[in-house]
């Protein structure tokens, strides 16, 4: 008989982990919402790579990787970006902590399922770059929403995030920025939904 697993119950708690802990947010965001949005953008970047740039890409795999990209935060919490990326030593140490948390989560699964989930926590270097770009696009969208709500607290974060995306030199992310980002400035009527 298979023992009970807490893997899915623990994943459902992602909604209790707030993002942007050091910022005064007008629009609260949690890790579960962020992971969904990152998955949408990762999928989009994969489709852009395949359909616009004619390169081989498994967009669905990117979406799955993005769904789980912050799962370790259930155990580690959301470490603010300025701390996480303060220097290489700290970044590398935190990567080890995240990896250990991922391993702990996977160990909660029954053996029969574990192998199927391991690939969702293991990305190639190329996949990791695209998921990171999607992660940054999600952060940028949050910054834009905060600015639109009159919250100047996010202006610097918006500039830094734009610069970080540009410095990735990913044609897919550049295409998204050029062809999709402007729509986030529009209201519902301007988006033509009616």
Question: What kind of region is each of these model predictions?
Answer:
Residues 1-194:
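Alpha-helical, largely C-terminal catalytic domains
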